[in-house]
């Protein structure tokens, strides 16, 4: 019998540094990578493109069931492909981010995408980036990490990111948006944003990304007995 491929789940709120950490770990271990948040963003973008009501679970479920999404790693970057088109940049807008959080609250939408996410589990292993990877999608994962940071730090990081891309932003407005999204994600009835009981909680507020990567890899290798 073929052994099931191992999974390292990285959960946490937006802006904690999950994406950077997951790419670094996938590269270090030479494993596959799943950006679960991107799947919800792709669904949200598809809904916006096809004028599907974001508040209608009945309308979103068929779209989720037939969503054509692929992840392609090229030169260290993760390309998100929707219906043959690279939408990596388009799904990172604030409009799509807010819409993704909205559609993710529907139980049947999550069920429709659950099977897609689990299908990414292939040898030699998978790094799964998301919000409920360790609690819902891969509850049997041998390594679970919950990456967190203060809302102020995450707002600051997001502000710098937007400014680097030429956008003018208001810190207080950004902070309020993040706190509102946190409240919605942490308190929703289905798959709320909480650490798995057996997860390592890693606070990145006062850590450099290099320190976060080092701590996460050390923990993962210890748990997996990888040299």
Curated annotation (Swiss-Prot):
It is an enzyme of class 2 (transferase). Its EC number is 2.7.4.25. The keyword Transferase applies. SUPFAM superfamilies: P-loop containing nucleoside triphosphate hydrolases. GO terms for cellular component: cytosol. Its main location: cytoplasm. One of its GO terms (molecular function) is CMP kinase activity. The keyword Cytoplasm applies. Keywords: ATP-binding, Cytoplasm, Kinase, Nucleotide-binding, Transferase. One of its GO terms (biological process) is pyrimidine nucleotide metabolic process. It is found in: Cytoplasm. ATP binds at residues 12-20. It catalyses: CMP + ATP = CDP + ADP; dCMP + ATP = dCDP + ADP. PANTHER family: CYTIDYLATE KINASE (PTHR21299:SF2), CYTIDYLATE KINASE/PANTOATE-BETA-ALANINE LIGASE (PTHR21299). Belongs to the cytidylate kinase family. Type 1 subfamily. This is Cytidylate kinase. It comes from Salmonella paratyphi A (strain AKU_12601).
